[in-house]
Amino acid sequence: MPLAKEIPTPYVWSYQPQMGVPAGASQDYSTKINCLSAGPRMAQTVFALRDQRNRVLTAEAHGQTPRPVVNPASWPAAALSHEPPPPTLLTLPRNEPTEHAMTDAGYQIAGGAAPWSGVKTGSFCGRGLQLAEPPTTAIYPSGLFHLGRGQRLVLDHQPARTLLLESAPSVPRYGGIGARQFLKEFTPAVYPQPYSGPPNTFPDYFCFNYDSVSNSVDGYS
C-alpha cells in the first residue's frame, strides 16, 4: 500500500513485568487514518503532522536510549536506575505520665511569672523554667502549646510522635528493569520502511523472542 510505505507508524514497546524486560514492540495501528474518507488535502496535512511526529519520536528514542543494544539480554547494575524504597512512617506511642508530670512541674518555654513549686510525681520534680517576659507558653498533655493571656497556639505535633524510616539496598539491584525505567527509556520507535524495506534491515530487537547474545530470533534462522 503506497500510503503505508510513505508514512510509517511507530512501534510501541510492551513490558514483561514478571521478568522485568521489554517484550518486543509492535506497530501502533491506531495512528493510521482512514484514507478512503480523507480528501487529498487532509491526507497530506495528516501525513505532514505524522512525519513530524515520527521525527520527534526518533529523536526521543536516540536521546532516551543511548545504548549500543536497545534491548540487551541482561541488565548490569550500572544500567539500572536505583530508586530508594518508599519511607516507612511509624507512629510512636505517647508517654502520658511524662507529659502530665512535665505540665505539673511547670515547664515553660518563655514566661515571667515567679517560679512556683511543681507537683512531685515519681522522678519528675520542677520549680519552673522561665526564659523571658511575660508569661507565654507551657506544654500541655495534649501536645499543644498554650500561650499566655488565654491564647492557644495549635501546632502540628505529629512529627514529634512519628518516626520516618528510610532504607536503601546494600547491594546494587541487577537483572530486570522496573516499570518506571521502562516507560522512561523505551519510547515509541519508528521503522522507516515497515513494508517495503529489505528483511535484513528490520530491527530484530522489536521481536519479543529476539536473543541479543546470538543476534537471532528464536525459531528463525
Swiss-Prot record:
Q: Which HAMAP family match?
A: ADV_CAP8
Starting at the broadest rank, the lineage of the source organism is: Viruses, Varidnaviria, Bamfordvirae, Preplasmiviricota, Tectiliviricetes
Q: Which UniProt keywords apply?
A: Capsid protein, Host nucleus, Late protein, Phosphoprotein, Virion
One Pfam annotation reads Adeno_PVIII
**Record's note on what induces expression:** Expressed in the late phase of the viral replicative cycle.
Do the record's keywords include Cell membrane?
Answer: no
Propeptide span(s): 113-150
This one is known as Pre-hexon-linking protein VIII
Q: Which gene encodes it?
A: L4
Q: Name one GO molecular function term.
A: hexon binding
| Sites marked Cleavage | 112-113, 150-151
